[in-house]
């Protein structure tokens, strides 16, 4: 999982990527290709 300052590019990496907010942090999750996961602190 990458730690990024901006998730816009991470969201556009794959069509299945989606942004989720959990516990005050923003995450990018990708079910079909999990290597595209990212988090913004």
From Swiss-Prot:
GO terms (BP aspect): translation
UniProt keyword list: Ribonucleoprotein, Ribosomal protein
Ribosomal protein is among the record's keywords: yes
Record carries keyword Ribonucleoprotein: yes
Molecular function GO terms recorded: structural constituent of ribosome
Pfam families for the chain: Ribosomal_L36 (PF00444)
Residues of the signal peptide: none
Cellular component GO terms, alphabetical: ribonucleoprotein complex; ribosome
Family indicated by similarity: Belongs to the bacterial ribosomal protein bL36 family.
Name the record gives this protein: Large ribosomal subunit protein bL36B
Organism: Vibrio cholerae serotype O1 (strain ATCC 39315 / El Tor Inaba N16961)
Lineage: Bacteria, Pseudomonadati, Pseudomonadota, Gammaproteobacteria, Vibrionales
Gene, per the UniProt record: rpmJ2
